[in-house]
Amino acid sequence: DFRVSINGQTLVAGYDYNKLYTEARADKRNASDAAALYDVKWESGQNFNLYSPSLGGQMKALVDIRDGCNGEFEQYKVDENGDYILDSDGNKVLESVLRNEQNTDFKGIPYYQSQLNQFISTLSESVNNVLKSGLTSDGTQHGISLFVTQTNTDTMTALNITVNPELVKDADKLATRSSAATGQAEADIMEQLRKLQSE
């Protein structure tokens, strides 16, 4: 009797067979996922678990690379009321949450995206806070953020970080000193930025 199984379930048994199909996800598993990634489903309605320990071969390898997040999910951080937590520039904050059910502990694309996003978020927040605390070279106004999100986005990620267009147009808006009493040539804000390297 000729038999082919996949994930512990029968695909072909003699002349009988079960069909599989793909369906785009309505919701993202990780906040940084591409929209409408595909899930595999049995046409019979039976559950096809992409994250089952019994899944192997090329399909498992592809799922691990596409969905591998080291047992974590990247999601938007919320407070006890369910409201989004925002950074000092008003961007939604991402966090990684450990959830092993229906998941893979392989370090695939989502894992490295999450690590990059965390680095970018920390870097941009630290640099922006230093610059916003300082004054422009003429001492008349506070500095503005160096890093912002691209238009029509509300979360600082490796994909959408950009240099503030206001600074591209007018570099005089960049903070260079910590107070009006500091001389123009001192540029002590740059020293504060340099110290971030060791923090």
Role assignments for model-derived ranges:
Residues 1-199:
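Structural signature of extracellular appendage/secretion-system components
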